[in-house]
UniProtKB/Swiss-Prot annotation:
Description of what induces expression: By androgens.
Name under which the protein is recorded: Cystatin-related protein 1
Species assigned in the record: Rattus norvegicus
Domain of life: Eukaryota
Transferase listed as a keyword: no
Keyword set, alphabetical order: Cleavage on pair of basic residues, Disulfide bond, Glycoprotein, Protease inhibitor, Signal, Thiol protease inhibitor
GO biological process terms on file: androgen receptor signaling pathway; cellular response to dexamethasone stimulus; cellular response to testosterone stimulus; detection of chemical stimulus involved in sensory perception of bitter taste; negative regulation of proteolysis; response to testosterone
InterPro entries given in the database record: Cystatin_dom, Cystatin_sf
Cleaved signal peptide residues: 1-26
Gene name linked to the record: Andpro
PANTHER family tied to this protein: CYSTATIN, CYSTATIN 10
Tissue: Prostate and lacrimal gland.
Length: 176
């Protein structure tokens, strides 16, 4: 009788340990998935991405006028997807606009093909360029929309969920 009681208690103890272990594993797995559900890209981080893009776009543009973002949309899933419309403003581009601009970034690449420009920015950081950004904020858009050069840019934000930051951003711009 003693052997059967000890065997039953041993099996019961193993069963209880198994239940605790499986519950803890399921809880840990669920918590890991919550990282992907949480949108940590707030408006300030997205504004920094837009500012970096406006700086790069205007720096590498051969146009004599500055361009700014007219319309924007952004959706966050596992990656962030968005669309912006770059439109020419009435403000002329001059070299002093980019004076004392501090662009903090790890790496960026620019690739041009007819009708498309691709900007890839790794660790976008931010851009410190008060003069250019304040000028863009105060520049009205060109009003003659039928003659307006527009570019639609689709972008993907590649987040770093561990660091709760943006790892890279890729913009693909197409002339309309």
């Amino acid at each position: 009788m003693c052997k059967t009681l000890h065997g039953t208690l041993l099996l019961l103890a193993i069963f209880v340990l198994f239940l605790n272990f499986s519950h803890a594993t399921a809880k840990r797995t669920r918590r890991g998935m919550e990282i992907f559900e949480k949108n940590f890209i707030d408006k300030n981080k997205l504004k920094d991405v837009y500012d970096v893009f406006k700086y790069l776009y205007n720096t590498h543009s051969a146009d004599t006028y500055l361009s700014n973002i007219k319309n924007e949309s952004f959706t966050m899933n596992i990656w962030g997807f968005g669309e912006i419309e770059m439109v020419k403003t009435k403000c002329r581009k001059i070299d002093s606009d980019f004076y004392k601009c501090s662009f903090q970034r790890e790496f960026y690449n620019l690739k041009r093909t007819p009708g498309e420009t691709m900007y890839y920015i790794s660790l976008p950081g931010s851009v410190r360029c008060r003069k250019l950004l304040s000028k863009l904020d105060n520049c009205p858009f060109e009003e003659q929309t039928e003659q307006l050069k527009r570019e639609i840019c689709y972008f993907v934000v590649y987040p770093d969920y561990i660091e709760q930051n943006i790892h890279a951003v890729r913009f693909d711009c197409y002339t309309k």
